[in-house]
C-alpha cells in the first residue's frame, strides 16, 4: 500500500464528502432538520464548532474510502468499479446501518432516514472514486 497516496486521495475524498454533505444536509434535508430542531426546541448550533466536527468526520470517511480501495484493489483490480465498491462499503457503515439502529428511537422517521441514506451515498461514492483515481501502488524495485 502507498500510504502517501492514501493520504492525498483521502484528503480529496474527504473534501468532496464535506462539500457534498453540506448540500445534502444544508439544502436537500434542511427543511426536515429545521422541523426536527423546532419540535425538540433545540437551540441553533455553533457554526464554527459544527464546521470543524463535520470536516474531521468527512475527512475520516474520505480516508476510510481510499484506504479500503487500496486494501481491496489487489482482489478487485484498479479502477472506478473497485472505488465504487469501497465507497458503498464506507457509505453503508456510516449512514444507512447507523440510521437503521436509530429508527426505534423515533427521533426521525423512516422516510427521512431513507432520503438521508440515498442522498448521502453520492458524496461518499464520488469522493471514493476521485480519491482512488489519485491512488497508485508504489513501484516495486527489481529483486
Where are these regions (language model features)?
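Juxtamembrane/disordered regions of integral membrane proteins
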Residues: 1-143
